[in-house]
Amino acid sequence: MSFLNSFRFNPNPSGDTSFIARAQQKSAPGIKVNVSALGANESQQSFGEDLAKYNIQPVWLSIENETDEQLVFPPITMDPDYYSSYEVSYRFHGTLSFAANRARDEFFLKRQMANILPPHSRTTGFVYGVLDAGVKYAHIVLAGNSRVETFDFVLPVPGPPFVGTNIRANNFYPDKNIEDLELGSLRTTFAKQTCCTTNSGGTRDGDPLNLVIVEARQDPLVPFIARGWHLARRLDVASAIETARAFLFRNAFLTSPVSPLYVFGRREDLALQKARSTIKERVHARLWLTPYAFEGRRVWIGQVSRDIGVRLTGQTWNLTTHKIAPDIDFDRAYLLQDLLMSGFVERYGYMAGVGAAPASAPRTNLTGDSYYTDGLRAIVFLSNQTTPFGAIERLPWEVPAPPSEEAR
């Protein structure tokens, strides 16, 4: 069948309106940038080939340059592993299908995004990037002789359901005003929040809530996705089967689901993870939107921990769960470092709230894994623009305890 298909090349760009309509737009004086990431079905229809099969994801761009100077768009800033048009088209070449091969080459080349943007022009095209699921991060740089502009996007990708997209406070708190806090009351309010996540009934404590994030005006996912975090799939039959398959064959599953935990009577609003090359190992974070704001910016509370293995359990419907590393302060520090390295942090600090649990008297989570902690929560204030590492403010609040001798 693949031999016969190599003689056929029937792209259908008539359906491009679906991804163009959901394109995100950002602008600077004299410049407008529209971007959209294609899902697997959209790219197959538009390009006539199953690009997702080869881990390729086209990203559509439309850039209006109304300035008086030429701008340069380097695609490598958007995706360091992007493909050339010929690299993509050659994957679908047939041995004897000369006419179809030539048509593929010309079609993919014609649609490739140009990197030179003349003054007073509108340029459209595609960057052939590496496949991402759930969301795709795009860092776009436009450079001229007298200016450099950067734009950061977190683009939704059509496909299976993920935990945490388009979250609105009024969906969770329709009858309650969001309380806007100043810095001092932010500290005291979140130091008094419940120590831990719970089960669905709120009768048992789970993993500790060791993280507070104050978002910026832009999408709070930007610093996470920029550092290689992925949204987690929603836990359902399909994702459970894929998880089991990855476990049995020792494969990676970058978007594997997380077990639901509860705060404010609901499961996590957002679940992110940074996985290794095996399903058994990952750092993951769950976040809940709170009924509080800081200077008009939404505030989240969450937990971060590190999975170091997978084991069977009778406490989950899919009979498997991850085992967490007991030193959760290490993982709190890892996430903080990762966000600092993204550049999208303006200040950070630590506050009370969890309650200390030494290694000699650890607590357990809902699946029986032990953990110990100094009892602090990290608080991170995100920013819209990148901040040099040395210019990031550290709040003079609590100080994390050094690792105890008994835990070494």
Where are these regions (language model features)?
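Low-complexity, acidic Ser/Thr/Pro/Gly-rich terminal tails and inter-domain linkers that flank the onset
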Residues: 8-54, 190-192
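A cross-kingdom signal targeting lumenal/periplasmic-facing segments of multi-pass membrane
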Residues: 57, 235-404
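Short, solvent-exposed beta-strand/turn "edge" segments of beta-rich domains on protein surfaces
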Residues: 43-62, 66-70, 116-118, 201-202
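The feature marks short-to-medium sequence segments in extracytoplasmic or secretory-pathway proteins
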Residues: 66-118, 123
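Short, hydrophobic/aromatic beta-strand segments
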Residues: 69-77, 138-140, 221-225
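Terminal, regulation- and interaction-focused segments at domain boundaries
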Residues: 193-223
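Second-shell loop/turn segments in exported
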Residues: 45-50, 65, 113-114, 206-213, ...
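Surface-exposed edge beta-strand/loop patches
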Residues: 3-9, 81, 111-174
